[in-house]
Each structure stands twice: as C-alpha cells, then as structure tokens.
C-alpha cells in the first residue's frame, strides 16, 4: 500500500462517466447521483447519449456520457468541466477529455485501449495519454480483466461478466469520494430482485472497484469529501424531470379527486413519463399506449369529456401531429394537459439532444384563433410543481394547457425533498351547479368566463360537444358571424383572466446594469452565470419565466426597468420575439444557441460581459 492518502474537502465536484452506449454509463452515473443525493448533497445531472440504439462498439459517435455536479450546498448546473473523468474505452477518452479540467483525475480501462480500439478512436500512436498531452492524475487499470477475475467462479459467461464493468468503475469513484456502498447494494438487490445472482455479482464487482482504489492509489494525489450543508430537513431523493412530471400529475389528480388518464405514443425523450405512470394503477392512473400521436391526444380529449384529468405526452414532432386534437379541446373547452419534452429539430432532428425550439409552435401552431396557456418547467424538481400547476389551470379554467420541458430537464436529475400533499392547494373544477338542471346549456359560464363542466351520466345535463362552432346561448351548431366573433373573444378572455405569479427578479434587482432573461430549463445555467458576474463586482439581475401564456402581469414593468436586457435561449430568438410582441418598445440583446447541448456558463459570462461593456 502507498503512503497515507490525503482527503481533500470540497464544496462541490463534477464527475463524468463515459463509455460505449452499451457500457452502462447512465446506470453508473444515476446510481452515483442517488448515493450523493441520499446523503444530503445537492446534485445536478446531465445524461448525454447518442440516438443510436447501439452504435458501433468503440466508435467516436457511440460514446455515452453522464455528468453529475455534487455540492455541499446548492448547485445550479451539471458543471462546465469535470474533476473526475471515467473513460471506459479509447473513444470515450478521445471525445470526453475536452470536458475535463486540467487538474482532473482520469480513470481508464486499459483493456479497452488495444490497437484496434485506438484505431477506431482515430489515435495515431499506441500511447493516447501522451498523444493527447494529458498531464492529469490517471488511474490506468485493467478493469475488464479484474472484473473477469473477480467473477471467475460465478458461472457467468465472458459477455455477462463484462456487463459489470460499469460497477467496477462506480466502486472506484465511490472510493474517490468516500461513499458508503450500502445504497448501491440495496438498489441492485431491488433492481435484480428476480435475478439475485446478477445482483450479487454486481455488488461483488462494486466492492472490487472500491478495494482496488483503496489498495492501489499511488498515482492519485488525493481523494475527495463533500459534506452536506442541507439546511432544510426532510427526506430527499434523486429524481429525474420525467419522473417528477409524472408524480406532479398524480398529485394533481389526487387533489382534484379525479382519475388520471394518459394517452400517449412512445417518443424520445418523453417516454419515461408513460413508463412511470404505468406503474401506478393502484393510485387511479390509467395509461394507454396508443397506435400513434393523434390517437394519444384524441383519446385524452375523450377521457377529459368523461371526467378525468387527461394528459397526453410527446416531443416536438408529436406536437405537429397532435395539433388538430389540441384544437378540438380548445373549441370544446375541455381540460387537457399536453406535455412537450422538447428535443433537437426540425423533423427527426436530434432525438436525444435538448433545445427550446418548440415555443412558437405551442403558442401559435394551430389553425384559427386558438389560445392556450403555456408553462415551462425550470429544473428537474420544478417539473413536479409545473405539472401540478398545469393540471390545476387546465381543470379550473376548462382549457388545454401546454407544459414545456426539454431533454436536459427531463433526463437530468436533482436532489428532491419529498413534498407533503397537504401543503398543496385544492383543485376545484367548475362543475355545473345542480340548480341549473334542466336549464343548462353547454357553453354556460361562471363569473370568470369559464364553461361549466358537466360529466356524462348526470341526469338533466345531457349535451353534445364537437369541433364545429357552437352557439353561445344554445350550444347548437352555428355559422352566425356575430356568434363566431363572440365565441372567439370568450375563449381568449378566459385565458387572459388566468392569474399567474409575477416574474421574480433575482440578484441586483434594484440597480442592475444588465438584466438576464430566460425561460424554462436554462434557469440553472443563467443563474450560475449571474452569480459569477456578481462575484466579479458586476451589477446583474435575472428574470426567469415559467409562465409564458399568459405572461406575468409585471412583465412589461420588469423589461423596461433596466438599461440593458439580454434574452438567452436555446433557439434562434423565439422568446425574445414573443416578448417584443407583448411589450411595446422592447428591444433586447439576444444570446442564442442551437447546439443540442446545455449552455456553458463560462461562455454565458463572456457574452454577457461583452454586452455589459458596450
């Protein structure tokens, strides 16, 4: 054993796992994130994987990565660069080293750096460390061989044994961060409950990786420890945005006293919501995997008519197909939540990458005057709140609502404090009053202009809804010009009357020289950029929007308060254009990227500083 290891105390650290898309890097990263969140650290994760089901082994295009930022206190992003890089093959080292700090510790499986591996990764020599000019601490271990040695008496074949390589790497990283392996053991025994031999093999390999680090660490300068500084007591868990979204819908249905119906068609990156909700039939959840996107949305409209909290989920291409059924819900004035987990486009585009390019589509991408509330979740944990709020708006205002997330928020995870349902407000749909029995008409409204909801089967409230325009007074089909104009106004006024919270200004809200504006899943990166600039003595504030339509009442006041405003978004300026349409005389600076990747905080700081200095 080498000399006593120095334990370095850190407030935050970034770890990136990388390897072939079949090497289990997503599982290893998720499990390490769960361990960290469970012990009280804050986390922010970024799964980054190719669209291929299984890319050619060892290819540069087939590398799958998972980055997690762990903090003693609050962290806002997965981090620009990592402190520890796990590269399970030559291609991973070649493509992922750019994400490593100059001081990073690098872990490689030398068994996957053979001549053929190096050729696939376009290395020109047999020494990739020297060729790339890497001066970092490197743990170069024959991981594949050690895994096979560890499981030699397991009875597993060679291929099955090598599937455990990710657990060896996880054990080694857990050693680097002084993590207890108990949580990982429990997770694996639960995951492989029907295959206990597989669970125990993986557990054995995790311990082998941990022990290897403990006993053979002469090439590493130090290990790390990140203490928890969590100030809010409670039970925490690591949760992805998609899972939080599913839980938010379940909570809303419970508070409304309704069944939850999801009509969906599988599409990356939204499918996990369908998977999660399908596990909860005992909570009154009904899920239907339909034959296509159109059927998914149309069936949800039918479920809404029947009296359920109805949801349909998709990504950008699916919104194109669902638009007709969404418009049907608009004219029928039925509650519906449409979840759009945005991805790179247009067309099939970049299915596993993230953008904010669906904003104008969900605002205006339907025929006719078709007003619809739009919300955008700001983080993985905020997906729970946003799903609840979208459901509440839909049910209480009898309207379809679009909830925007994106691949970064949906697949990423964060430490989430389990909420108490009693702390959330009741949801009160505008059910038709019993005293209107016999005199009620389908488009009769309450004092807020919201159509009453009559559930089929109620005696005295038989009615028909449909896609043809209806007479406001009788509910009969009408082509009367004045009536159509009136109904168009009533549908718009109903949306305009929805009360949403004011947009909050953070940072130097009283005297900022630059206001950063964003919406949805870019919140963490923009907040981190603001923090860095303020630490340098610059006067900067942030206004981040969750409610897009209707906009908060104080939007114009905030936009006009500061001498310079920059709107930063992952599209070519859709939100900036929307704000210009809504706020007279508003001419902001713009920061636009459409790379399929999250913002890089250092690049944001440089761009915002340049604007500030103009």
What name fits each language-model region?
Residues 2-256:
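Active-site cofactor/cluster-binding pocket
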Residues 12-100, 247, 252, 260-261, ...:
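Thiamine diphosphate
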Residues 13-20, 169-171, 260-263, 310-313, ...:
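Short glycine-rich or small-residue beta-strand-to-loop segments that form or flank ligand, phosphate
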Residues 50-54, 113-117, 146, 294-296, ...:
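Short gly/pro/ser/thr-enriched loop/turn and capping motifs at secondary-structure boundaries
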Residues 52, 149-151, 218-234, 252-259, ...:
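Gly-rich Lys/Arg/Thr-decorated short loops/hinges at beta-loop-alpha junctions or inter-strand turns
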Residues 69, 87, 107-109, 139-142, ...:
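Short beta-strand segments
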Residues 134-136, 140-144, 353-402, 406, ...:
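Conserved thiamine diphosphate
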Residues 231, 238-248, 256, 386, ...:
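Flexible, low-complexity linker and terminal segments
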């Amino acid at each position: 054993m080498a000399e006593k290891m120095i334990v370095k105390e850190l407030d935050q650290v970034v770890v990136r796992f990388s390897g072939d898309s079949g090497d289990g890097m997503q599982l290893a990263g998720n499990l390490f994130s769960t361990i960290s969140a469970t012990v009280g650290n804050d986390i922010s994760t970024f799964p980054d994987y190719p669209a291929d089901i299984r890319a050619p082994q060892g290819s540069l295009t087939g590398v799958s990565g998972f980055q997690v930022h762990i903090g003693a206190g609050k962290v806002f992003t997965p981090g620009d660069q990592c402190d520890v890089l796990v590269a399970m093959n030559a291609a991973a080292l070649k493509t992922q080293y750019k994400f490593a700090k100059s001081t990073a510790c690098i872990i490689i499986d030398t068994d996957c750096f053979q001549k053929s591996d190096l050729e696939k990764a376009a290395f020109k020599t047999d020494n990739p460390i020297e060729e790339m000019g890497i001066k970092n601490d490197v743990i170069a271990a024959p991981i594949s061989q050690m895994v096979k040695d560890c499981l030699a008496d397991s009875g597993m074949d060679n291929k099955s044994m090598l599937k455990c390589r990710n657990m060896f790497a996880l054990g080694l990283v857990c050693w680097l961060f002084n993590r207890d392996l108990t949580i990982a053991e429990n997770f694996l025994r639960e995951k492989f409950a029907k295959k206990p031999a597989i669970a125990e093999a993986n557990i054995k390999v995790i311990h082998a990786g941990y022990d290897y680090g403990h006993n053979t660490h002469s090439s590493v300068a130090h290990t790390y420890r990140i203490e928890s500084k969590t100030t809010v007591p409670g039970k925490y868990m690591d949760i992805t945005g998609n899972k939080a979204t599913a839980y938010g819908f379940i909570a809303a249905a419970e508070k409304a006293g309704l069944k939850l119906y999801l009509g969906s068609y599988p599409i990356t990156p939204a499918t996990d919501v369908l998977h999660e909700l399908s596990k909860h039939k005992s909570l009154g959840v009904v899920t239907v995997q339909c034959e296509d996107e159109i059927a998914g949305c149309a069936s949800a409209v039918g479920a809404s008519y029947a009296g359920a909290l109805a949801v349909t989920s998709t990504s950008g291409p699916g919104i194109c197909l669902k638009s007709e059924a969404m418009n049907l819900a608009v004219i029928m004035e039925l509650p519906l939540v449409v979840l759009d987990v945005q991805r790179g486009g247009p067309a099939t585009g970049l299915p596993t990458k993230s953008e904010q390019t669906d904003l104008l589509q969900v605002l205006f991408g339907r025929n006719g005057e078709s007003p619809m509330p739009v919300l955008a979740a700001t983080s993985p944990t905020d997906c729970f709140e946003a799903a609840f709020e979208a459901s509440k708006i839909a049910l209480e205002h009898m309207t379809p609502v679009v909830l925007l997330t994106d691949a970064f928020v949906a697949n990423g995870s964060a430490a989430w404090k389990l909420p108490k349902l009693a702390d959330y407000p009741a949801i009160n749909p505008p059910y038709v009053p019993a005293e209107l029995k016999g005199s009620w008409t389908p488009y009769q409204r309450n004092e807020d202009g919201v159509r009453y909801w009559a559930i089929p089967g109620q005696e005295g409230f038989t009615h028909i809804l449909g896609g043809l325009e209806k007479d406001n007074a009788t509910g009969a089909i009408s082509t009367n010009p004045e009536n159509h104009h009136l109904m168009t106004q009533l549908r718009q006024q109903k949306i305009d009357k929805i009360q949403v919270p004011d947009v909050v200004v953070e940072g130097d809200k009283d005297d900022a020289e630059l206001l950063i504006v964003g919406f949805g899943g870019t919140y963490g990166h923009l907040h981190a950029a603001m923090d860095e600039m303020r630490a340098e003595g610059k006067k900067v504030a942030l206004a981040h929007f969750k409610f897009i339509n209707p906009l908060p009442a104080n939007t114009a006041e905030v936009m006009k308060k500061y001498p310079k405003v920059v709107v930063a978004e992952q599209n070519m300026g859709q939100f900036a254009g929307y704000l210009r349409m809504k706020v007279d005389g508003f001419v902001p600076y713009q920061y636009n990227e459409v790379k399929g990747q999250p913002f890089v905080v250092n690049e944001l700081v440089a761009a915002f500083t340049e604007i500030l200095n103009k």
